């Protein structure tokens, strides 16, 4: 006996006068908007132009939709080219039928073309976009609920989804596993993990995107095993199960093999895009003898307007000499900046190297701080 069940919508389309508004398409549109907004905010946090999210989406979305439809048609050919299929239905995407793998492949191709035109690294953009993409997928899954499609095996669980007679796989069974809900919840979990990992460990170089792919495909594996809709099989397993397994393994390999390079190996463009240009150094208070009381910390900040080094709150720019703790910086391209210590002590005996801006080196001593910048190349 079923005590409760998730009801299905009576219809998946609403007519605004003569214009039909299909819920499936509406979910996709909402997902795209969310992805663009989230990605834009993450790009801004990285010091990049948030408008890049919309510019790349302008290419990625059409390519993704076409790729999703192509994958769906190729993975379920009988529905279109079989004995009872209709070739004309290939273009009717409003009736459902978009393969997520084709969407990812097509969207990646469109994003790559856009990134080349804009002159940015696709890997850097993909890391910023990963949480937004998985959120878009979560929202898009509700389109399956409106269309009463892609549900799982029959069940009497309280959270089962009730399917109308016209859409039932078995005329005698009314409730099924709500696979759309499982994938929605899993995608939210993946989004939370990505945001947490990115906050604590800036993976970089496309590794966060690889983590997104690995986590999503891992969840898709067991969700796919619950589905009972018609699909082609290889060795007794659905094609999507094989695809999920292969892509998951590939993503894990990429996550393990691709290492974040040390700063000298990162191009200036990528440093600016990720905010790796370190241009703000803050020292801990010193004791009476001039010894450094705490470790020197370097904050990461990206600034398109300046290429200088900020030492103790003052900017050092080759084109605009500044005064740093009482020491004037003269010249168009300063290399060494000597700063008298706050207690007035002279040069100390020892120096402690710390990380500087743009791979420059800084030495903190009891008497002076020296900031060295490498010659321009």
From Swiss-Prot:
Subcellular location(s) of the protein: Cell membrane
Positions of region (Disordered): 265-377
GO biological process terms held by the UniProt record: lipoprotein biosynthetic process
Enzyme Commission (EC) number: 2.5.1.145
Binding site residues for a 1,2-diacyl-sn-glycero-3-phospho-(1'-sn-glycerol): 141
Recorded superkingdom: Bacteria
Involved pathway(s): Protein modification; lipoprotein biosynthesis (diacylglyceryl transfer)
Membrane-traversing stretches: 18-38, 48-68, 93-113, 119-139, 177-197, 208-228, 238-258
Keyword terms: Cell membrane, Membrane, Transferase, Transmembrane, Transmembrane helix
Name listed for the protein in its UniProt record: Phosphatidylglycerol--prolipoprotein diacylglyceryl transferase
Natural source organism: Frankia alni (strain DSM 45986 / CECT 9034 / ACN14a)
Gene name per UniProt: lgt
């Amino acid at each position: 006996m079923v005590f409760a069940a998730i009801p299905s919508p009576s219809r998946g389309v609403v007519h605004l006068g003569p214009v039909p508004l299909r819920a499936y398409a509406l979910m996709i549109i909402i997902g795209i908007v969310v992805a663009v907004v989230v990605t834009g905010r993450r790009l801004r946090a990285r010091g990049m132009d948030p408008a890049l999210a919309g510019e790349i989406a302008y290419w990625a979305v059409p390519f993704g939709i076409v790729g999703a439809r192509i994958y769906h048609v190729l993975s379920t050919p009988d529905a279109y080219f079989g004995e009872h299929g209709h070739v004309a239905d290939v273009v009717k995407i409003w009736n459902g039928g978009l393969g997520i793998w084709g969407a990812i492949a097509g969207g990646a191709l469109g994003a790559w073309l856009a990134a080349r035109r804009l002159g940015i690294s696709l890997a850097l953009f993909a890391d910023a976009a990963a949480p937004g993409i998985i959120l878009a997928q979560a929202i898009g899954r509700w389109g399956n609920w409106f269309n009463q499609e892609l549900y799982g095996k029959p069940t009497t669980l309280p959270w089962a989804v009730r399917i109308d007679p016209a859409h039932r796989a078995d005329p005698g069974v009314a409730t099924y596993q709500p696979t759309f809900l499982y994938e929605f919840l899993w995608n939210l979990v993946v989004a939370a993990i990505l945001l947490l990992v990115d906050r604590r460990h800036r993976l970089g170089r496309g590794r966060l995107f690889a983590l997104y792919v690995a986590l999503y495909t891992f969840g898709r594996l067991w969700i796919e095993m619950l589905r009972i809709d018609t699909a082609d099989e290889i060795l007794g397993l659905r094609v999507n199960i094989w695809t999920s397994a292969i892509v998951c393994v590939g993503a894990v390999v990429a996550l393990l093999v691709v290492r974040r390079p040390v700063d000298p190996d990162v191009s200036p463009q990528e440093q600016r895009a990720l905010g790796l240009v370190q241009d703000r150094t803050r020292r801990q208070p010193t004791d009476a003898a001039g010894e450094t009381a705490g470790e020197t910390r370097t904050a990461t900040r990206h600034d398109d307007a300046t290429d200088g080094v900020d030492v103790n709150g003052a900017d050092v720019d080759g084109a605009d000499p500044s005064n740093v703790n009482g020491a004037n910086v003269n010249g168009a391209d300063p290399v060494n900046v000597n700063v008298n210590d706050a207690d007035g002590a002279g040069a100390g005996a020892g120096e402690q190297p710390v990380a500087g801006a743009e791979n420059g080196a800084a030495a903190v001593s009891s008497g002076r701080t020296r900031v060295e910048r490498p010659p321009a190349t």
